[in-house]
């Protein structure tokens, strides 16, 4: 199936990096290498890329993209395109990986579940961004992953193809192999529409 995303202009470093990779054909043949039901689908890892036989392709992917976290304007509601990154201990500036991205799915929250989640986030002693009432309403309406807010750059959103994201997030995975799908879910082709 097809997934159409819009990239945010107020995250220009991430937008431009993603478009550069799309236009180079980098994502063609990559897989969604990490899939966690009711959480997210992650793709773009260089090591998963299928190389075209008879063609030498070399990409410089040994860089990071400076964080462009614009919270609360962009939060981890369902269908957000976000940049993966190393954890806080290795990466206190929250710089993004050069190629890895994820699309959020998360769960739909009832008012009671949302209240429980917010209280848990407040009491865990981690530096979570506690969602405002308006953002909580968004999570109850659309679903999402609130514990990632203000920790990762959200740089776009799915405009069409959420049903494809849903199918991918429901595939069988190997939990002992970093949640890799048992059968490869391949990005056949990524192109810039406009």
Model regions: which residues?
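Cyclophilin-like peptidyl-prolyl cis-trans isomerases
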Residues: 1-194
């Amino acid at each position: 199936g097809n997934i159409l995303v819009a990239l945010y202009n107020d995250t220009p470093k991430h937008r431009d990096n993603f478009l550069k990779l799309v236009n180079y054909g980098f994502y063609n043949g990559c897989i969604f290498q990490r899939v966690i039901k009711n959480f997210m689908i992650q793709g773009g890892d260089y090591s998963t890329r299928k190389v075209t036989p008879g063609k030498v392709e070399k990409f410089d992917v040994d860089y990071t993209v400076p964080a462009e976290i614009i919270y609360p304007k962009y939060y981890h509601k369902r269908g957000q395109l976000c940049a993966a990154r190393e954890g806080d201990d290795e990466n206190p500036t929250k710089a993004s990986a050069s190629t890895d991205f994820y699309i959020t799915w998360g769960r739909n929250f009832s008012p009671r579940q949302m209240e429980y989640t917010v209280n848990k986030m407040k009491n865990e002693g981690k530096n979570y961004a506690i969602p405002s009432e308006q953002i909580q309403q968004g999570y109850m309406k659309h679903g999402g992953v609130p514990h990632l807010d203000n920790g990762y750059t959200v740089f776009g959103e799915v405009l069409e193809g959420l049903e494809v994201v849903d199918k991918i997030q429901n595939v069988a995975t190997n939990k002992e192999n970093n949640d890799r799908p048992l059968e490869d879910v391949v990005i056949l082709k990524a192109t810039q529409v406009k």
